[in-house]
Amino acid sequence: MRRTLTLAAVAVIAFATTVFNTTPAFAHGYVNAPASRQANCAAGKVPDCGNIVYEPQSVEGPKGLRNCHANIPQFAQLSDESKPWPATSVGNRVTFTWTFTARHATLNYEYYIGNTRVAVFNGNGQQPPQTVSHTVDLSGYSGRQKVLAIWNISDTANAFYSCIDLQVGGSGNPNP
């Protein structure tokens, strides 16, 4: 009897430890079209990307950042401008498509070139579907540009970050 109670107690403790001490998975969302830097890494198109190849959806950090890696050291390669990031040739209007692996209530989506916000789309505090697309007007820009796309979550202090390399105007060599 005592052995049965001991085994039951151990099982309850093991279950409670697993349930209450589990670290949340950092799997959420990224821009997959045009291919973001993390999408290119996951597809094997850029060498030496590190752990991002396994979790392109995990670039999450505090709101307000303006870098490609959300200040996560193991994803610092995403902000390395010396890497051969392929650029997608586009016209002056570009449709960005986000893919979500965990959907969160959304404050908004922001798109930046340099320090200039070129577009913002309201999320109305709603949970998005599995994919969301936004068409952004890049008139006034030409040549190689890096777009920082940000998915701001409405009920946390965090956001998800994706950088997309583009050749705006569709002419010239899209490679760095």
Where are these regions (language model features)?
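Extracellular carbohydrate recognition and processing domains
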Residues: R117-S139
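Active-site-adjacent structural elements in folded domains
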Residues: A11, E81-S82, S133
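Membrane-topology and secretion signals of cell-surface/extracellular proteins
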Residues: L5-T6, V10-I13, T116-A119, Q126, ...
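Extracellular/periplasmic catalytic domains that process cell-envelope and extracellular macromolecules
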Residues: S89-V90, R103-A105, Q127-P128, S139-G143
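Extracellular/periplasmic metallocenter environments
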Residues: T131-S171
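Composition-driven, intrinsically disordered low-complexity tracts enriched in small residues
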Residues: N173-P176
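Secretory targeting and sorting signals
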Residues: M1-A27
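N-terminal "mature-chain" segments and other terminal, solvent-exposed stretches
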Residues: A25-T116, N122
